Amino acid sequence: KINENAARTLEYAYNDWCIYQLAKALNRPKKEQKLFAQRAMNYRNIFDKESKLMRGRNEDGQFQSPFSPLKWGDAFTEGNSWHYSWSVFHDPQGLIDLMGGKAPFVQMLDSVFAVPPLFDDSYYGQVIHEIREMTVMNMGNYAHGNQPIQHMIYLYNYVGQPWKAQYWLRQVMDRMYTPGPDGYCGDEDNGQTSAWYVFSALGFYPVCPGTDEYVLGAPLFKKATLHLENGNNLVIDAPDNDENTM
């Protein structure tokens, strides 16, 4: 088997999609564009219809067995299947379809918060800090302390339940970013965890970097003004905003 094969497959698929977008913008030959467009769909190859989750495969192409979505590492990187199964930034509708449509997709999103913060650390042989942070956060199997799952909450918007996104976004911002000595929730790889907070506090987030799309969330402020490099201002105006109004 190849270590971290599921995580690599998912991230390479997204990378190939980004290359595809660049190839289109540069008007590269259609053959090149088609190649990377096809490779961007490779995430489908590790979707397990039975569990409705992403699952690692062996070199012979068979799914790794036995399979536990609570197992950290192995086919994944510092996370488990509950965390990585949402890593289809570039094709959320495709992921929704794989999981059976909107209702099953919502059920799977809900399950992340409903499944207790249990874990299998046998691959690492110890409780790595990312696992410890997930258990301390006590938000089910949602592990905001590491980057792979941080966009997941915004996916509620894609299936017509933005109020769930708004609720959980506020929960994360209020509980996992505080001024106390234990007030920061985990890794800060490439500035992602703080960038998540800045975007989310303003009320929008780039679920899929590589596009010009931002997904709406729940701003923390009644008004915020961003002074853009081109001299324009972006104003987020939410005069009725408070802790109970999202």
PLM regions and their residue ranges:
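Active-site core of glycosidic bond-cleaving carbohydrate-active enzymes
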Residues: 1-41, 45-220, 224-235, 240
